[in-house]
Design a protein with these regions (language model features):
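Terminal, contiguous helix-loop blocks that mediate binding/assembly
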Residues: 1-295
């Protein structure tokens, strides 16, 4: 369907949201499905927002205090993370302030056709009953975002464990980043947040980018998800590497012994072995490109 839309609307900016399946599930061919899907999306769209079921479920339990999250709870958590990216927002301030549309955001976040995977981190995230009592300062929200980015996780709980634990944060390198501030005093706080990030080098960018710290920033005075202040970081960088490594390793193990290929080549008849080879080559090259951001 996405390929058809790309054919019908060649000038449009196309963006997809892909949800990575659980690491262990009852669907034995999930790694094949993810491989084929992501490799096709890379050639058809301008950007792909990646979410993981495991991370969303952990957010439900650790941050929203839902002991037994349902599918609706998990979907709501993902939706609340992507919502600040899609809602109207502005760039600049004063008379230079202008509306920032999604196509502009994607152009900044994905300036190279080989780098299209986008990661979203959002704070705060609390239990529903605590939302109206949450009044984090902009500096506190920025610290949360920095810890989450350094740890490569969308969960504040996991970021805190790495911060105070024995394991050193991975400190992933980005190609580009978009920081979104929404709520009370967002426009006034934007420049201070960017200055703080640049001075601390808390969010790293590839050495070959124009300034070495390729940020875009958007603001909106309106609340989102009920919070007086909230902050979202969209990054295009190495946080995707662990997932791609795991996906390619599992899919390669199955492909090497020919496991379940008949379900695609014989039963459905729409795919051939060469299609798998092309997908491995495409996603493998993408993984290598993201790894090279840090070199």
């Amino acid at each position: 369907m996405t390929e058809s839309m790309a054919d019908f609307f060649p000038e449009a900016t196309l963006v997809n949201i892909a949800v990575a399946p659980y690491h262990f599930s009852e669907v034995v061919v999930q790694h094949y499905n993810s491989l084929l899907c992501l490799s096709k999306l890379l050639s058809a769209v301008h950007g792909v927002f990646i979410f993981e079921n495991e991370v969303a479920q952990d957010l439900c339990r650790s941050m929203r205090r839902i002991n037994r999250p349902t599918l609706d709870d998990i979907n709501q958590t993902m939706s609340s993370n992507i919502l600040p990216v899609l809602l109207p927002k502005f760039r600049g301030g004063g008379p230079c302030q202008r509306h920032s549309c999604l196509s502009n955001d994607i152009a900044d976040l994905c300036p190279h056709p080989q780098y299209k995977f986008l990661d979203v981190k959002h704070t705060p995230q609390t239990a529903d009953a605590s939302v109206e009592f949450t009044f984090d300062s902009w500096s506190a929200l920025l610290k949360n975002i920095e810890y989450m980015q350094a740890a490569g996780t969308a969960s504040e709980t996991h970021a805190s464990r790495q911060r105070f634990g024995a394991n050193k944060p991975a400190n992933y390198v980005n190609m580009s980043s978009l920081l979104i501030l929404r709520g009370l005093g967002a426009s006034e706080a934007a420049s201070e947040c960017i200055t703080s990030m640049r001075s601390s080098r808390s969010i790293r960018h590839a050495v070959w980018s124009d300034t070495g710290d390729y940020y875009s920033v958007c603001t909106s005075p309106f609340y989102v998800n009920g919070y007086q202040r909230s902050m979202t970081l969209v990054s295009n960088g190495q946080t995707i590497v662990p997932y791609l490594q795991r996906l390619l390793m599992k899919a390669t193990e199955m492909f090497r012994v020919g496991a379940y290929l008949h379900q695609y080549t014989a039963v459905n008849g729409d795919l051939q072995v060469d299609d798998f080879v092309d997908s491995f080559r495409s996603l493998g090259q993408t993984l290598q490109d993201y790894r090279s951001l840090g070199s």
